[in-house]
Amino acid sequence: MQVALRLAAYPCEVMAASFNRDKILRMNRGRMPFTFLPMDELYARADMVVVLGGDGSILEAARRAAPRGVPVLGINLGRVGYMAELELGELDLLSRLFAVDSAGNPMWHTETRSMLGVEILTAAREVRASMYGLNDAVITNGSIARIIDIELYENGRLVTGYRADGLIVATPTGSTAYSMSAGGPVADPRVSCFCVTPICPHSLAARPLIFPDDATLEIKNICQREKMLYLTVDGRTNCELYRGETVRIVRSPLKTRLVRLRSYGFYDRLRAKMADYS
């Protein structure tokens, strides 16, 4: 609520999601005018989306904002908030959204982040489902901790097979999330790549791999013990992956634009956000 009140003091229209209407009206008590809209209409009309929450909330906002090219400003209410630009104690920096420097340039900018385009192909190579994500695509056995068998292909050529608990394909943005926890590399978002990280591989030789993001990656379910595996994109979208089916991953034409109010570099942010967990 205090974020909305801060923004309402500037020359802008503050729009809020309809599901927050009762809470905001109760706290606002008529002090400031707000426009309440359904989520789809909100994203269609917005020039910028301000998200209060953790990284999960920002991922959901990115999914909705990317098709419209709307920039996203994250304010951390979660634990790490790696993609968030501000903490609650830094709301004074919101003034930079409406300020210019001595040369007349805006005092904020956006970072463009690549996204994954993900499709599920049937055994007959027909597209059964498609989705996109900012962080990662994860193939696992679901809630049962049982090893799976999959094959990884790049541009139609077999790279390797895995016997593992699962496999993560991450963007540079997603390389600091689940992939990093599984022992994957941290990729600077200026690098155009996919990070492929096996989860608990049953092998002495299995290692994380990095591919250029103009490659087409395919992961085929060859597991004979299980009827189906599960594909999860950004921890939100969950689909069954049946035996003989394939997940195809490419660089999506969509981009996420993250609003930055400071000149922090990638490694400054990495140190600051991860310091409490090192």
Features from the language model and the residues they span:
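Gly/Ser/Thr-rich active-site loops/lids in small-molecule metabolic enzymes
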Residues: R157-A205
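ATP/nucleoside-binding phosphotransfer catalytic cores, i.e., glycine-rich phosphate-binding loops
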Residues: A123, I139, N155-L158, L204-S278
